[in-house]
C-alpha cells in the first residue's frame, strides 16, 4: 500500500499517495472492485488509469468507505453524496486528496524543482517562502 503521507485535523484530513502499484493491485485495494473495473475502462492512457484509481484508493484509505467522485462542468470534484468537500491534485507519480465535512478545501501538489520557486508567490505566504529558501540552502 503506497500511502505516502496522511494527516487529520478537526476541520479536515488529507493524504498523499505515491503511485507505484499496478492497476490490478489498486483494484484489489478497493471495495466494489467490479464498479472500479468498469469505470477505469473510460481511460485509454495507462497513467490516467493509475492516477484515477490511486485517487480512489487514497480516498478509501482516508474515509474507510466507498465514495463516488463526480465532477462539475468546471472540472471541480465533489462527492456524489455531498458528505464532504473534496479537492484532488496530482503531479508526476503522486496524487493528493483533502476532505472536510465542514468547510470548502483545496490542495495542490507539485513536483519539487525550479518551477516551484518560480510560482511560489502565487500560493505561499512570504514567511513560508522564506522558510522554503532557507531549507534549500541547507
What is the predicted function of each stretch?
Residues 1-138:
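Core catalytic alpha/beta fold that binds nucleotide/phospho-ligands
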Amino acid at each position: 500500500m503506497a500511502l505516502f503521507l496522511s494527516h487529520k485535523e478537526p476541520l479536515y484530513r488529507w493524504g498523499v499517495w505515491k503511485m507505484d502499484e499496478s492497476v490490478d493491485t489498486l483494484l484489489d485495494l478497493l471495495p466494489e472492485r467490479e464498479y472500479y473495473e468498469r469505470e477505469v475502462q473510460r481511460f485509454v492512457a495507462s497513467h490516467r488509469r493509475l492516477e484515477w484509481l490511486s485517487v480512489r484508493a487514497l480516498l478509501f484509505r482516508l474515509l474507510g468507505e466507498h465514495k463516488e467522485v463526480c465532477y462539475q462542468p468546471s472540472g471541480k470534484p465533489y462527492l456524489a453524496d455531498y458528505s464532504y468537500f473534496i479537492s484532488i491534485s496530482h503531479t508526476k507519480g503522486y496524487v493528493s486528496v483533502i476532505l472536510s465535512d465542514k468547510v470548502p478545501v483545496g490542495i495542490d501538489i507539485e513536483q519539487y524543482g525550479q518551477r516551484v520557486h518560480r510560482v511560489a508567490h502565487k500560493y505561499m505566504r512570504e514567511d513560508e517562502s522564506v522558510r522554503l529558501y532557507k531549507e534549500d540552502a541547507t
